[in-house]
């Protein structure tokens, strides 16, 4: 497993972990972080930080999955369209601006109405044993509504895009090497990826940066 911590300034850190959950978070910045955490829906993350915003890119993908697998239902498309509208409204804000309270209230009312629609549709078309993701998503979106819509109230990102980009790059690399033979190999890859990504974020020449790293003299033994 690879744990990725990314900041709004574009910096990131990758950690090799044998386990998910609290054991995977131990020793990472998240363990002591007190700010707002932007994350996918892993309930473990709710034990850390002071506030939470679920990554809406994940939610949009899950909604698309429901649309593809449950074409007889309408709630998922309505919710996807609403989320796109909310994101567009936030993107249109100028620096220091915030959404009007009435606009936010309208978004939240429509969110509730769509979740009520989902309840009615699943009563009429119960989820099958082969696909329950849409049903579970609707229940989850109601239970974690505050974390889903925090970005309407506060200046927080609505997606963890930096972590997503790094994760995609790392997954492509894993496909190339097939598998890491040891945790040590995965740890080395995480350290190297952390260094390279942060050099790029700072606008540094990656080749020169890595050359400086390898040119360092190891400290003398104590």
Predicted regions and their residues:
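Catalytic center-proximal scaffold of phosphoryl-transfer enzymes
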Residues: 1-222
């Amino acid at each position: 497993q690879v744990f990725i911590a990314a900041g709004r300034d574009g910096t990131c850190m990758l950690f090799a972990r044998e386990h998910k959950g609290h054991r995977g978070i131990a020793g990472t910045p998240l363990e002591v972080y007190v700010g707002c955490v932007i994350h996918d829906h892993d309930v473990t993350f709710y034990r850390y930080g002071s506030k939470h915003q679920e990554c809406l890119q994940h939610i949009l993908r899950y909604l698309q999955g429901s649309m593809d697998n449950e074409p007889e239902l309408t709630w998922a498309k309505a919710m996807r369209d609403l989320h796109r509208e909310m994101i567009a409204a936030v993107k249109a804000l100028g620096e220091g601006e915030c959404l009007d309270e009435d606009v936010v209230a309208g978004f939240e009312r429509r969110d509730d109405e769509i979740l009520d629609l989902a309840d009615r549709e699943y009563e009429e078309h119960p989820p099958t044993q082969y696909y329950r993701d849409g049903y579970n998503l609707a229940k989850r979106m109601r239970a974690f509504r505050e974390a889903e819509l925090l970005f309407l109230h506060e200046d927080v990102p609505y997606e963890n895009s930096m972590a997503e980009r790094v994760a995609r790059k790392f997954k492509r690399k894993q496909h190339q090497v097939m598998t890491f033979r040891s945790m040590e190999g995965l740890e080395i890859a995480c350290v190297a990826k952390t260094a390279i990504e942060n050099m790029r974020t700072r606008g540094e020449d990656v080749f020169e940066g890595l050359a400086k790293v390898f040119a360092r003299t190891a400290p003398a033994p104590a």
